[in-house]
């Protein structure tokens, strides 16, 4: 276990040589002076007692005995008495008359009370998985006090690899959805409750009507006005609750995917009356809530259901899980238009419900190992949620090891979800002092510079962002040089402490990754320097076990391998380099400004579709490359992107033609694409190799679209995208 023991001056109440009447002495000169008494011997109280026992021992060397169902006495710690001074998960710490009592308002209140005592009185900070700091002292004395605390939100969750450490999870006062939702049914549950694999063929009428026909599939939605669905779903829910008698909440919520709601005449009528597709959903959930009045039902307000209905109101036991997925993150939600659109939805739901679960995003799905400086908005957004009747909060953030300051972000969110009035900057500095030690001033300066540069640039921060988006802003060359100088100093400051050095090197990975991503977009760079940077990045990731680079679990080792193959010069000469493009069917309008150059500029696109790629949606591509003169053609390859989460699928086929006059073309060959359901982001080459070389000046490329997204895809029934960048003629 990694531990860091920091010797620091103790506050007077811990260092006093004698015990004042109002104090409780737990340990004196390393010898236990008190015992821990369980008011009730249950799992929560015993865990709280063991937590206190452990850290008192590690701080002082003295181990307090634990007594079940013992009597109150002088100099004892009583854990688990009930209190009505706090709400669920809340606690009271009362030190008076020679007794220290940690009282609970229910659930894990006793554990959280012990955590508060250890933090505020013993100086223990549990900062990440298996990592904590404490203040050694042979004497532990608790002053007179009476403190009552309740959480701002009754449910608090965030992603973090540290959550695998149960002590950390309790310390951050975090919960897991499986603790509350029956059968782990907490989001996107439609296909689990009414499986399209079971009912799709025999009852397509149960599923969304989109673009002229029913579209059953595991990402399709339900036809919520169909009278037969309700009883099937109600029966299924009844069986789930009976199998999980200790849980009384379930999610009945739309499958993932946008605009896939039913548009049959009956559903359309309800949607038009309610002013939102959410109308059908709330009506359906209300019926379930009436059928099971002692249960609680959660449903999503997400993408097409984000805005509330005009007329129907959720019943009290219907929970609205409201998601702000489409908002930008460079400023608080109140300060940009995407945020204000979400705020209108939040305020609308708050007018008709006091039972709101906010799902907030602080993640870059496409590049989790990239800078994402959103720390300055965390507090304001959480306060906003609280003001608008949110009682439950999930913060979806970059939580895997190696992602951008994952440990700091999880720590700050845990603290702010419990108490949004805490000072965010103080939290950041406290964490950094404990987790980065002597390197903390440099990393704090880095975060301040990065945030300032982001705001000064005016560039939005997006959940599908790329470092390349910011290469002229917060990641410009001069700033990257300054950031690296700070990290150099940070590494020097902790060079003798292997644990701290590991923390600093992991924190530097997003900067290293950004430099690699930016380097591949700039021609004429130093190949040897880039190779060295790539080796360093891969080595550090392997050394510390960094598992992935994006939401789709693309591995670091694959990234490094593909980078060498794809982005570093390999001697291949493209005879179509710089060719003029003649469009028969041009790309979507937003991609036309880059299209003339992007297909033959020698710069390959990365895993994020927003840079270098050229896209078509729901239609074919047809264009001609004018190479300027007759050239020998042996092989043609076009590069395609595969990214299912963005509706980017491989097309049906690509055909290549050759011509001498741009009028009469002869077919050279066709590449057919197999169906690919792999969720990984990848690059797919479409190559045709000729049996014998031909002479040609013009190369025509015709790509046949897949058409509509298939039944298994998020965009079922809607036009699919395909993206390509380089066309290479050899």
Model-derived features with residue positions:
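Short, well-ordered secondary-structure micro-motifs within conserved domains or adaptor modules
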Residues: 65-87
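Feature activates predominantly on carbohydrate-active enzymes
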Residues: 32-33, 43, 48-51, 55, ...
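Bacterial Sec-dependent N-terminal signal peptides
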Residues: 1-25
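Structured mid-domain segments that build the active-site/substrate or prosthetic-cofactor binding neighborhood
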Residues: 228-229, 340-439, 445
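Aromatic, loop-rich ligand-recognition surfaces of beta-strand-rich domains
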Residues: 605-669, 684-730
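Acidic, His- and aromatic-enriched active-site or binding-groove loops in soluble protein domains
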Residues: 270-288, 316-335, 415-422
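Substrate-binding cleft/loops of secretory-pathway carbohydrate-active enzymes
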Residues: 298, 302-326, 369-374, 402-410
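Catalytic domains of carbohydrate-active enzymes that cleave complex glycans
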Residues: 416-597
